[in-house]
Every structure is written in C-alpha cells, then in structure tokens.
C-alpha cells in the first residue's frame, strides 16, 4: 500500500531541480521493492552486491517507478555501501516526483 508523501520527509531532500533520496539497500532478496521502515526507505533487490548489480537494480527500479531517465539518476554517496544517497537531476516538478515516489513505496 502506498504511503503518504509527508511520511517521506526524513528520506527526501529537494534542492531546486534536484531531488536526493536516502535509501538503505538489502541485496539478495526475493523481489525488488521499496519500503518505508521506521522512517527510512529500504530497497530490497534480488541482485547480489557484486559488480554494481544491486546499484543498477536500484537505479532501474527508481527510473521505472518515477518515470525518469536512467541518465538523470546517480548514486552520489555510498556506491560501495548499503546506505546510499541517490540524486535525481532535471526534475521539472518535484512535488509530482514525490507523489510518484510515495506511490511506489510500501508501508513497512
């Protein structure tokens, strides 16, 4: 079930036409999903944390769910860590992007 946008405020930062999302990644799961657990976004992926596969899974999941180009998404902090900061660039309408984010996040 999607969450309310207000519940994402601790995990999201809007910087003009950029949006930064703090995500904790749990690799080698059964499926790909994004959950809100105790105020933190947690991405579960079926990919292992090898050769950037879990990172690519996260970027592709966000691109598809948020309807943005993969080239506009970058992991700006934590590429080799499970705690990451993902930046989405060239966001025309941050409020609409946050609504789309809320629609792909499950309650944890």
UniProtKB/Swiss-Prot annotation:
Name listed for the protein in its UniProt record: UPF0235 protein APE_0182.1
Xref: InterPro entries: DUF167, YggU-like_sf
Residues forming coiled coils: none
Family, as annotated: Belongs to the UPF0235 family.
Pfam families membership: DUF167
GO cellular component: cytoplasm
């Amino acid at each position: 079930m999607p969450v309310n946008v207000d519940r994402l405020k601790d995990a999201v930062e809007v910087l003009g036409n950029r949006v930064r999302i703090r995500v904790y990644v749990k690799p080698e799961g059964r499926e790909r999903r994004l959950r809100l657990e105790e105020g933190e976004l947690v991405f579960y992926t079926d990919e292992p944390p090898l050769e950037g596969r879990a990172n690519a899974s996260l970027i592709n999941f966000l691109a598809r769910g948020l309807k943005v180009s993969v080239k506009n998404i970058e992991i700006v902090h934590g590429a080799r860590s499970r705690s990451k900061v993902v930046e989405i660039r060239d966001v025309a309408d941050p409020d609409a992007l946050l609504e789309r984010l809320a629609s792909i996040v499950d309650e944890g």
